[in-house]
A protein has these predicted regions:
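Glycine-rich, acidic/polar active-site loops that bind/position phosphate-bearing ligands
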Residues: 28-479
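Short, low-complexity, charge-dense intrinsically disordered segments
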Residues: 2-22
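Short non-domain terminal segments
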Residues: 1-2, 8, 181, 450
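Cationic, low-complexity basic patches in intrinsically disordered or flexible, solvent-exposed regions
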Residues: 25
């Protein structure tokens, strides 16, 4: 999927006039936002933030409550960072638990994230982020982690532009029906594989068009939307933006797709690997660094044989070096590793290449405007804040330490290029590498790594306790 990766100053001004955001989610000032909230007939506001798994956790508050906290703090129970994706409390994390009593944690509403939810009568919506009792960024909040890494980039004079693309499966089911069927024999939205199919998108035209149009109205503009290989599978590329806005869009995209799907009597899933016989779902992140003015792509060098600047080569070397140490940021759950298998459009080796879809890091450097790096390890099950933070932090590590890109670009089948090693094969293996890694703590912060590793160790333990269908089929009668 080609994602154009920078506009000229003129184009950016034009987009502002057209109210399509490049780096900002809205074009209303604080007074205009406040007035909109006052005037909205619903009398309520929706606010949300993500937990460690990227799940959007939020609530409605009254307009009166909103006005009382908009210039100070609101609060969420800190169990948001003390339980897993199924709301089961961790028994091994230090940050919060029964030992702390699960107190409220302060959260700040970010007015710059203001949006109107078009499928909820344009009710006002805001994202927030956790802070600690001293008003400092919370060490476990994913959005705060990304802001910390961004500050490191800005301090060096870099303006990161990012975007994410997602693949996902759609089923003609409901949340109730998939549970009633125990997630077996589900009916896909459309049968057959049909990648890039005009026919299949036309057969589900209302849903397909609603995705494109409603997401744009919610300020998640798409560059492209098409069917992907797999029954009922879609792929969307979100327009690039400055990194915080890009991550906000990606986080909101996943929840928005699920809500829009429900309006069309179907259910969307962003599991990385839904079936061993079907392709997995990627969540590739595209990235480039620009100068502070946003006018010069620092990754591009016309004189280089591969059109890559020395800075880009340092950045790639940093990602390759850090990747085995931070893989859970890109592959966060048990199922993630079912996707990372040979010959399934997901990488398995520590490789890079130019326009090569078999490697971990794909360089696209044809033009100054579009020159960027695509990190293909990332699955659709990822927390975008964490994935983008890890991409940027590891790239900056390579720049800061002037790492040389000594490894040659993989030509042809990257699955067979073992010259730099392979990716960890399970969540446990990857988590233990991250736990022991000094570089992970250096680039992401010791307190964050401690908490994140504890949550991944919990996830692995839950998996070990589970009795699977495979075990029943294999052992129930014969053993």
């Amino acid at each position: 999927m080609k994602i154009s990766h920078k506009a000229t100053v003129f184009t950016r001004l034009l987009l502002s006039v057209l109210c399509v955001s490049v780096g900002k989610p809205n074009h209303m000032n604080k007074n205009e936002i406040i007035q909109y909230v006052k005037d909205h007939p619903s009398g309520k506001v929706k606010i949300a933030l993500t937990d460690i798994d990227g799940i959007l956790r939020g609530k409605y508050i009254s307009t009166e409550k909103f006005f009382s906290v908009v210039d100070s703090n609101t609060g969420f129970c800190d169990v948001i960072f003390g339980w897993d994706s199924n709301d089961v409390a961790y028994d091994n994390v230090t940050f919060t638990g029964w030992h702390t009593g699960y107190p409220d944690a302060p959260a700040k509403i970010d007015l710059s994230t203001f949006r109107k939810i078009p499928w909820e009568n344009d009710v006002p919506f805001f994202l927030g982020e956790m802070i600690d009792k001293d008003g400092q960024p919370s060490c476990v909040c994913p959005r705060q982690l990304l802001k910390k890494v961004l500050a490191d980039a800005n301090a060096e004079g870099y303006l990161p532009f990012f975007s994410q693309e997602f693949e996902w499966y759609n089923f003609a089911e409901s949340p109730q029906s998939v549970h009633d069927k125990q997630f077996k024999n589900l009916t896909p939205l459309t049968p057959g594989m049909f990648g890039y199919s005009i026919l299949r998108s036309s057969l589900q035209n209302p849903f397909f068009n609603d995705l494109f149009d409603l997401l744009r109205k919610f300020n998640i503009p798409l560059e492209g939307l098409h069917t992907e290989t797999g029954p009922g599978t879609y792929e969307a590329a979100i327009n690039y933006a400055e990194i915080i806005e890009a991550a906000d869009r990606a986080v909101l995209f996943k929840t928005s797709v699920k809500e829009i799907a429900d309006r069309h009597n179907c259910i969307a899933t962003f599991m990385a690997k839904i079936n061993e016989n079907l392709p997995g779902c990627g969540g590739h992140v595209h990235q480039s660094l620009w100068d502070k003015s946003g006018n010069k792509n620092l990754f591009y060098n016309e004189k280089d044989s591969m059109k890559m600047s020395g800075l880009m080569k340092n950045y790639i070397a940093g990602q390759l070096y850090c990747l085995p140490n931070i893989l859970p940021m890109f592959a966060p759950v048990i199922n993630s590793y079912k996707r990372l298998v040979e010959g399934a459009w997901a990488p398995t080796t520590l490789t890079w290449g130019v326009d090569n879809r078999t490697v971990a890091l794909r360089v696209l450097s044809a033009t100054n405007k579009s020159c960027r790096l695509e990190t293909r390890v990332i699955g659709s099950d990822v927390n975008p804040y964490l994935a983008m933070a890890a991409c940027l932090a590891s790239g900056l590590y390579g720049i800061k330490n002037k790492l040389k890109l000594k490894q040659p670009a993989s030509i042809g089948n990257g699955y067979k290029d073992f010259s730099n090693g392979t990716l960890p094969k399970t969540l446990d293996e990857a988590t233990q590498m991250m736990k022991k890694s000094t570089v992970a703590k250096e680039i992401l912060g010791e307190k964050f790594v401690e908490h994140f590793v504890q949550t991944r160790e919990w996830e692995w333990r839950q998996h070990l306790k589970a009795v699977t269908d495979w075990e029943y089929k294999r052992y129930f009668e014969i053993i």
